[in-house]
């Protein structure tokens, strides 16, 4: 975000000793600003998300959640991005609070390899359906691009991204 200003204001959402800020810009901008300007020292861990939708495979490069985590790792701060495979604005994140806390505390205690950002994706399931945690490599799938050209009521052209996921190797 080199063509606009970044705004940052101290806020208070949760009670506790943590410092809380609201910053404009992209998630990666906010991490850069926080680490290099706002905070007096590097944080022990950057936790990004939880966001709506999967950040698996190629989707990592489009994700604000993961861009924040990756930026933190580039800055030398261990990082985790959390995502839920549910695009609904009424998504229920509650079943995953305990797991997020468990992963976060384990990362703080045992550490994360230098310049590494963990990418944690939760399926859209109920709490009683959770069977555990599986560590895996990033998938090799990609999106087969297709754009539907449409016209809005004012007669202006726009495009709707459609397409499909390819499960073949790149």
Question: Which positions does each model-derived feature cover?
Answer:
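A cross-family phosphate/adenosyl-ligand binding-site feature
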Residues: 1-30, 34-35
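Glycine-rich phosphate-binding loop signature in dinucleotide/nucleotide-binding domains
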Residues: 38-42
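Glycine/threonine-rich flexible loop motifs
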Residues: 54-63
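Active-site rim beta-loop-alpha module in soluble metabolic enzymes
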Residues: 84-90, 108-153
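Short, glycine-/small-residue-rich phosphate/pyrophosphate-handling segment
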Residues: 86-104
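Conserved small/polar residues in nucleotide/adenosyl-binding loops
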Residues: 168-169
